[in-house]
């Protein structure tokens, strides 16, 4: 699609939780059923690093930047409305480096989570950020697909009123 080509920029770095150099585990064999190609060190993966090495994964060093630092360096002309995150177990690594961006722009997020611990951490984080969390799909490989949207002030006020009404009913029976 030539129209999309004008709006896409390919950059030679990985998004992470720090501006640094990190180990990236990569495989050229994406058809073996173990991965879609690679993951950054610290990702929550279904198998041990030793297993990945035994099937041909190699360690390479990659430049990493936070999404916050990337967004600060870009000249944003359109506010991001939707962000999709599918990063093979590095969801919370990415999110840790994107908090300023998320707080400033309040985008809708579609995230594929790769473990129960990532689901819990993501739920805790976005509950504090006043996001509504909806599970779209879950499969038998510990992957959960979620949709997160910011709760508006109007929705917050309605939730508070509903909770106050609930507490009154409980108190007075």
Describe the residue ranges of each PLM region.
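Phosphate/nucleotide-binding beta-alpha loop and adjacent structural elements of enzyme active sites
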Residues: 1-173
């Amino acid at each position: 699609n030539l129209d999309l080509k004008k709006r896409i920029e390919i950059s030679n770095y990985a998004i992470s939780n720090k501006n640094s150099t990190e180990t990236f585990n990569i495989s050229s064999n994406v058809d073996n059923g173990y991965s879609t190609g690679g993951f950054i060190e610290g990702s929550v993966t279904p198998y041990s690093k030793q297993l990945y090495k035994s099937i041909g994964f190699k360690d390479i060093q990659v430049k990493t930047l936070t999404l916050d630092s990337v967004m600060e360096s870009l000249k944003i002309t359109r506010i991001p409305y939707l962000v999709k995150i599918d990063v093979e177990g590095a969801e919370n690594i990415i999110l840790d480096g994107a908090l300023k961006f998320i707080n400033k722009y309040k985008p809708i997020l579609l995230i594929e989570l790769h473990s129960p611990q990532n689901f819990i951490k993501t739920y805790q984080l976005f509950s504090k950020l006043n996001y509504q969390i909806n599970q779209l799909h879950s499969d038998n490989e510990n992957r959960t697909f979620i949709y997160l949207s910011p709760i508006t002030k109007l929705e917050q006020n309605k939730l508070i009123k509903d909770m106050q009404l609930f507490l009154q009913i409980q108190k007075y029976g």
